Swiss-Prot record:
Organismal lineage: Eukaryota, Viridiplantae, Streptophyta, Embryophyta, Tracheophyta
InterPro entries in the record: Histone_H1/H5_H15, Homeodomain-like_sf, Myb_dom, SANT/Myb, SMH1-6, WH-like_DNA-bd_sf, WH_DNA-bd_sf
Assembly with partners or alone: Forms a homodimer and heterodimers.
Segments of the chain annotated as binding DNA: 28-57
Principal subcellular localisation of the protein: nucleus
Subcellular location: Nucleus; Chromosome; Nucleus, Nucleolus; Chromosome, Telomere
Role this protein plays: Binds preferentially double-stranded telomeric repeats, but may also bind to the single telomeric strand.
SMART domains, per database record: H15, SANT
Gene expressing this chain: SMH5
A GO BP annotation: nucleosome assembly
Alphabetical list of PANTHER family matching this protein: SINGLE MYB HISTONE 4, SINGLE MYB HISTONE 5
Designated name of the protein: Single myb histone 5
Length: 286
């Protein structure tokens, strides 16, 4: 286990804000290498900066009564104006920094539209994202799971259990014949490759859309100028979306496990059939 992460200091938060103002959202490595900021942020990584910036700009309300009570108290305060608005947002989010839920949605969707049929569509979109990664990587011998994961993480905001979800999806796609797995590398099946090249992947629909990192960063900047009430409402919606993504991940894992069980049963049946045939041939020879 690594060393426990230290709580962010006010100097580090100020340095992060200055770095974002100077280099822009998403340029975490440039911020860490900035001569004026590197000494203050020397104990922080790219991921630390990304997560902290997201937490500083999104207020997430938990389901406990205590948190709801605290949120209600904040909402009774007069809404700040102009520049005081951003300062109030930063102060409040700093107070609840340790209680903020790590929300990293890979797909944004309306909660009302989340049902069984939409769950199947979401699975299809995740399949397409994996297909897109393998197609764009275009490696002759196929792409390793780590390479696929890195590509998706660069293009989208994956959920916290992304590794488990990706492994389950790759196993399911390989079992169903959509992907070929050779030496731990994945390639698109030849029968599907022509369809993928002929028809562009459609990752969105009327009920949902896939957000890239740049779009998410732009959304966070927009949320920084919201009132406390509007930001709290948006954060609550983000929590609901994250819960929907978790439900999707669990369903995908169950689907992959079911497919694996079917494959094992089919293999056992085939082995039993071969053994029966051998026994019959042996009996005839006797």
């Amino acid at each position: 286990m690594g060393a426990p992460k230290q709580r962010w200091t006010s100097e580090e938060e100020a340095a992060l804000r200055a770095g974002v103002a100077r280099h822009g959202v998403g340029n975490w490595r440039m911020i860490l290498n900035d001569p004026e900021l590197s000494s203050t942020l020397r104990y922080r990584s790219n991921v630390d900066l990304k997560d902290k910036w997201r937490n500083m700009n999104v207020i997430v309300t938990s389901s406990s009564t205590r948190d709801r009570g605290r949120t209600s108290t904040r909402r009774t305060r007069a809404a700040p104006k102009n520049n005081d608005q951003l300062l109030a947002m930063s102060t409040i989010t700093s107070e609840v920094d340790d209680e903020i839920v790590d929300v990293k949605p890979i797909v944004s969707m309306s909660v009302e539209g989340w049902n069984t049929s939409n769950s199947k569509k979401s699975h299809s979109r995740l399949d397409n994202i994996i297909m897109e990664a393998i197609k764009n990587l275009n490696e002759p011998t196929g792409s390793h799971r780590t390479t696929i994961a890195n590509y998706i993480e660069e293009q989208y905001w994956p959920p916290s259990d992304f590794d488990h979800l990706l492994s389950a999806k790759l196993k399911y796609l390989a079992t169903s014949g959509k992907l070929l797995k050779v030496n731990r590398k994945y390639r698109i099946a030849p029968s599907l490759l022509e369809d993928v090249q002929r028809e562009p992947l459609k990752l969105g629909s009327d009920a949902s859309r896939t957000l890239t990192r740049s779009q998410v960063d732009a959304e966070l900047v927009r949320m920084a100028t919201m009132t406390v009430e509007a930001a709290a409402a948006a954060a609550a919606h983000a929590v609901a979306e994250a819960e929907a993504i978790m439900a999707e991940a669990e369903a995908a894992a169950r689907e992959a496990e079911a497919a694996e069980a079917e494959a094992r049963a089919a293999q056992a049946f085939a082995e039993a059939a071969v053994l029966t045939l051998k026994n019959r041939n042996a009996a005839k020879l006797v």
